[in-house]
């Protein structure tokens, strides 16, 4: 047996002792573990495996020599303590090779009390800390780190789950709102469709009654007999309130009401209706207190008839006033002639010539480029040369009324105009009225007072 082995056996045979001074510098836990090592015979130079075997020798021996029962075909195999230690040592060495190094510090331990024969031995260097203790602390730290990591993972998972739940909630809310909007829109469309369908019969009734107001499909002339049914049309219009057809129906009603009012206003100035079913009655007589003003309805054909009716009424008013003046003048003349000597009576031709000579023909056309080509009535030189024809005689007040109208419309100023004969048609003499510069204004009938030009907005058709 080598000297080293003999020394080892001697050390193992020594009575274990724990120095008190050393114990003072240790904690209670460290002192307890140190005492257990001393009692187990652990030496400073022992490896971790040797320390483990010495501290758990009884358990190892008990496990090794415990009797185990097997089946008959099995047999008991005994392993020696040295082989077991060798295997455990190899396992520990592998574990130490793969694990991280654990720093340790070494302090010089005071020598334990020895027997007399061992007094000459040098002090032993003992580890200040037990490797087993350090291993346990490292494992504890690893366990704590693992717990912290698990807690962090749990918190992370919890946060992820909460985020997912929040997103799911938002998606559910958005989906619910979208479904609500779709349902609301569908409901509104259904209600609108039902409303439109329900009002279709009212629309048909309105259009039927509206068409009945006109004499033709072009809706240019109105039936006077339908005027009192305008209130019924208004009732049907009110039924369409809120529907999409109401706007169009309202515009139709407003236009119709305007036309009816215009016709009624003009007819009210005559002793009997002058416009009946869109046609002018030229035999209608204007009232003595009639007041005529230009009226526009937007219906071109109706506006023409209204203009003719207004012109007719104004000409009648002028004729009436002129006749009254003539009668007054005649009475005065008769009274004066009764007090004087009777004289030869002038010929009728001279009276006619005198009457025509009193017509104010305005300015002379000499040297002026008159727009005769724009005349609405063709020039007839033979008729113009027949100057003694009574067709050229103006009816009482006709010329004065026409000139007054022209002045009010701004066509002429004062007597600044040119008046020329044009033609005789159906016993009526037609004249052209021009501006002083020769600009054509219109052609007039000296008997009826009807006049027509080329401008828009007034009469467009000739009266023959």
Curated annotation (Swiss-Prot):
<feature type="modified residue" description="Phosphothreonine">
    <location>
        <position position="67"/>
    </location>
</feature>
<dbReference type="Pfam" id="PF18041">
    <property type="entry name" value="MapZ_EC1"/>
</dbReference>
<dbReference type="GO" id="GO:0051301">
    <property type="term" value="P:cell division"/>
</dbReference>
<keyword id="KW-1133">Transmembrane helix</keyword>
<dbReference type="InterPro" id="IPR041295">
    <property type="entry name" value="MapZ_EC1"/>
</dbReference>
<dbReference type="Pfam" id="PF18708">
    <property type="entry name" value="MapZ_C2"/>
</dbReference>
<feature type="compositionally biased region" description="Basic residues">
    <location>
        <begin position="1"/>
        <end position="11"/>
    </location>
</feature>
<feature type="region of interest" description="Disordered">
    <location>
        <begin position="91"/>
        <end position="150"/>
    </location>
</feature>
<keyword id="KW-0472">Membrane</keyword>
<feature type="region of interest" description="Disordered">
    <location>
        <begin position="314"/>
        <end position="365"/>
    </location>
</feature>
<protein>
    <recommendedName>
        <fullName>Mid-cell-anchored protein Z</fullName>
    </recommendedName>
</protein>
<dbReference type="InterPro" id="IPR040532">
    <property type="entry name" value="MapZ_C2"/>
</dbReference>
<comment type="subunit">
    <text>Interacts with FtsZ.</text>
</comment>
<feature type="topological domain" description="Cytoplasmic">
    <location>
        <begin position="1"/>
        <end position="158"/>
    </location>
</feature>
<feature type="compositionally biased region" description="Low complexity">
    <location>
        <begin position="315"/>
        <end position="352"/>
    </location>
</feature>
<comment type="function">
    <text>Early cell division protein that marks the future cell division site and supports proper FtsZ ring positioning.</text>
</comment>
<comment type="similarity">
    <text>Belongs to the MapZ family.</text>
</comment>
<keyword id="KW-0597">Phosphoprotein</keyword>
<keyword id="KW-0132">Cell division</keyword>
<feature type="modified residue" description="Phosphothreonine">
    <location>
        <position position="78"/>
    </location>
</feature>
<keyword id="KW-0812">Transmembrane</keyword>
<keyword id="KW-0131">Cell cycle</keyword>
<feature type="compositionally biased region" description="Acidic residues">
    <location>
        <begin position="114"/>
        <end position="142"/>
    </location>
</feature>
<dbReference type="GO" id="GO:0005886">
    <property type="term" value="C:plasma membrane"/>
</dbReference>
<feature type="compositionally biased region" description="Low complexity">
    <location>
        <begin position="100"/>
        <end position="113"/>
    </location>
</feature>
<feature type="topological domain" description="Extracellular">
    <location>
        <begin position="180"/>
        <end position="464"/>
    </location>
</feature>
<feature type="transmembrane region" description="Helical">
    <location>
        <begin position="159"/>
        <end position="179"/>
    </location>
</feature>
<feature type="region of interest" description="Disordered">
    <location>
        <begin position="1"/>
        <end position="21"/>
    </location>
</feature>
<keyword id="KW-1003">Cell membrane</keyword>
<dbReference type="InterPro" id="IPR030858">
    <property type="entry name" value="MapZ"/>
</dbReference>
